[in-house]
Amino acid sequence: MNEFKYLGKKVNKPSKQLDTFPKPKNITHVMFEGEELTCLCPVTGQPDFNTVVIEFEPDKLCLESKSLKLYLWSFREEAVFAEGLADIIVSDLFKALKPFGCKVTLMQNIRGGLQLTAVAEKKR
């Protein structure tokens, strides 16, 4: 089994490290969904609240969920548009997991009466 940096340990700060582990034999699709992804509007500095759906088709690796939580937490103080954030997340996940495909759907909470959904996808 892999050595996990965060799993089973007390952690009180965000991290950009994504821990992985070997994919179980019959797993073909993995999906995470969370409603607590926050970042800052790069124009106003106001917080943006997002729901994120992460899907990937693993080749050899799966993603350890605690490291993902800490990774998503790391954006709390970053100023970035939703479209840019979706692109950053899919790129980082693709680099760490080397999956057949990865898709990130980011749904920003309604602001000014508009619902924004940004989808970023990478495939081999």
Name these PLM-found stretches.
Residues 1-124:
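N-terminal intrinsically disordered, cationic/polar leader segments
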